Structures are given as structure tokens and as C-alpha cells.
A protein has these predicted regions:
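N-terminal "assembly arms/tails" that initiate or stabilize quaternary assembly
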Residues: 1-83, 303
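Extended, compositionally biased alpha-helical segments that mediate assembly or anchoring
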Residues: 3, 266, 271-309
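Short alpha-helical segments and helix-capping/turn motifs at coil-helix boundaries
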Residues: 27-34, 170-172, 272-273
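Long, contiguous amphipathic alpha-helices that act as assembly "spine/axial" helices in icosahedral shell
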Residues: 47, 77-139, 177-189, 279-295
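Short helix/loop capping segments that flank catalytic or ligand/cofactor-binding pockets
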Residues: 55-58, 101, 194-197, 204, ...
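Extended, solvent-exposed, turn-rich assembly/linker loops in the middle of proteins
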Residues: 135-218
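Intrinsically disordered, low-complexity regions enriched in Pro/Ser/Thr/Gly and acidic residues
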Residues: 201, 207-244
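Glycine/small-residue-rich hydrophobic helix-like segments
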Residues: 226-272
């Protein structure tokens, strides 16, 4: 038998911390999370883009003439993200099971329900990523096309052009002056299979460790990109992006006043709420883990897609 002896905040914190190691795709993008809402602002949050500054040149002649330097303002844009979806996992805790079978509420209730919630995040991010266009194989500077288009950049099924495709992806992002840090290539299962068959990449393969889902998903590191497999993406789809191309916002709502046990917590870009209460009609407890979710393209110029021939 297990009971609610562990403080709700401790259970919730451990559940949120576990999400970091149970997720891959969400950890490669911009994340914005808070425990609770700021009153009066509704369900749309403004996620900040990186701060930008401008540079200027002061010539030797200007210095000799004592020409004053010019000051500019730092700029920052915000992307509105609507928290449209409530992702949740709700379970019943029948009295007989709760009394004689359950041994650890934290491990057997809180953790599995939190895992169910985090499993939904990559699915929703994948829906967003497939909207990004691919460069044309014949002309990198031409207008973008859908990744399945006959003109789109594609990886050959024999993996013979893996390095050429990665070089093109880097060229496209570099030409757009996208930062070279935090770059990722995420691919569906068919693309991942082709890449892993390439013998030239065998020595560059990244070995997984510590049971970390992001490490487990990493296929290789190529030309400044971390290449990961994401099964929720279309199997013949791949996308190269910098972290701030996409954003994911999570909010853990306030614990209801009627809940006898509960807490919310945000950490490292993830947020969850755990609540439990009693169902008098069934003489049993109930547990819910949830979060309000929203995702958006922050800057489409920081991403480019490709397909599989």
C-alpha cells in the first residue's frame, strides 16, 4: 500500500526533472515554461527572440576629426504563442489496487502519467516542422518548395550523397546568417536508416549514454549539426534548424482549490501540474498530470527541410 505521504511539490519536481531525460525533439528548440499564469494576459504568451544589436565602423579620419560615435538601441522581437491545447493524462486509482498493489505513488502513478504527457510533445512539434519548405536541389537560392516536391533537395536511398545534402543545408542556413550554434538535423525513420547505412559516417557516430533520450536519438554530428532521429516526423522527411527557429510554450495551471493533493512546477523549459482528488461516486482517488501547450515558428529563415528520394 502507498499513500500521499510524499509532498506534492517533491513529486511534481521529480516528474518535471524526468521529462528532460525522456524527451529529444523538444530539447533542441526554444522552450518557454512557467508554473502558473500571469493574471490578466489570457492564454497567449509572448516568447522572446534573442536580443539583437548593430555594429558600426569609426574610420581613422572620423577619429582625427573627433566625430562622435552613434548609439543604437538593443532590439528584441516577441512571438505570440497561443496555449491552445491542454495535454493531460488522467487515471483512476481504484481502492483495491491502491491499497494492496500500489507500492510507490511517485514511480507508479506520477512518472507514467508524466511520460504520457511528454510523449505528445514531439507529435505536435512534428506537425509544425513539416510546414517548413526545402531548398531546390538545382538552385539553393531559388524559392523554397515542399519537401516531397520533385524539385526539392533529397537524400538518395543509397546514402551516397549524405555529405552533399548536409553541406547544402549548412550553405542555406549560412547564407541566411543563421547562428552556427545549437544547430540540429531531425529526421524521420526512413531517412535515419539511410544515414546510418553510410559507412563513411560510422566513425562519426555518437554513442548514447546514461539513458538520456536525446543522447539515444543522436545519430551523428556532421558539419556543425547534431543529427537526431525522431519517429514522430514523416519517415521520408528531414529538417535542419537552429534552436530559435521554433518555440514551445508550456504552462502549468494553478492547482484547483478543491484538489486535496497537488502542485505545479516549471524547470528547464518544461512545466507540469499534478493534482489528485477523491471521487465519492466510485469511492476511489483520481490523478491528473497536465500542462497547457502551444508551439509556433519563431523564424522560418532558421530552418530548411529536405526529403528522401
Amino acid at each position: 500500500m502507498a499513500n500521499f505521504t510524499t509532498p506534492a511539490m517533491k513529486v511534481t519536481k521529480s516528474s518535471v526533472a524526468a521529462l528532460r531525460y525522456l524527451s529529444a525533439l523538444p530539447r533542441t528548440i526554444n522552450r518557454d515554461a512557467e508554473a502558473g499564469y500571469e493574471a490578466g494576459y489570457g492564454s497567449t504568451v509572448n516568447v522572446p527572440m534573442p536580443v539583437k544589436a548593430t555594429a558600426a565602423t569609426r574610420t581613422k579620419g572620423q577619429r582625427a576629426a573627433r566625430t562622435a560615435i552613434n548609439y543604437t538601441d538593443l532590439t528584441r522581437q516577441y512571438v505570440p504563442v497561443e496555449l491552445a491545447d491542454q495535454i493531460y493524462s488522467a487515471v483512476r486509482l481504484p481502492s483495491d489496487w491502491y491499497t494492496w498493489t500500489l507500492q510507490s505513488f511517485e514511480d507508479e502513478v506520477a512518472k507514467p502519467t508524466a511520460e504520457a504527457v511528454v510523449d505528445e510533445l514531439p507529435k505536435k512539434l512534428a506537425e509544425l516542422m513539416v510546414t517548413i519548405q526545402a531548398s531546390q536541389a538545382a538552385d539553393a537560392s531559388a524559392a523554397g518548395v515542399g519537401y516531397a516536391d520533385s524539385k526539392a533537395l533529397k537524400l538518395k536511398s543509397d546514402s551516397s550523397n549524405v555529405l552533399e545534402v548536409v553541406a547544402r543545408l549548412a550553405r542555406v542556413l549560412n547564407s541566411r546568417e543563421v547562428p552556427t550554434t545549437d544547430r540540429t538535423i531531425a529526421v524521420g525513420s526512413a531517412v535515419a536508416e539511410v544515414i546510418q547505412k553510410n559507412r563513411d559516417l560510422a566513425s562519426a557516430a555518437y554513442q548514447a549514454d546514461d539513458g538520456d533520450s536525446l543522447h539515444e536519438a543522436i545519430i551523428s554530428r556532421l558539419k556543425g549539426f547534431t543529427v537526431i532521429e525522431e519517429p514522430r516526423l514523416p519517415e521520408k522527411f528531414g529538417i535542419a534548424y537552429q534552436r530559435d527557429a521554433f518555440t514551445m510554450a508550456l504552462r502549468a495551471a494553478t492547482v484547483p482549490l478543491g484538489a486535496s493533493y497537488g502542485a505545479n512546477h516549471a524547470e528547464d523549459g518544461f512545466a507540469l501540474r499534478l493534482i489528485c482528488d477523491y471521487d465519492p461516486d466510485q469511492a476511489e482517488d483520481r490523478a491528473v498530470v497536465d500542462a497547457f501547450f502551444g508551439a509556433a515558428v519563431m523564424d522560418a529563415q532558421r530552418a530548411t527541410a529536405f526529403g528522401l528520394a
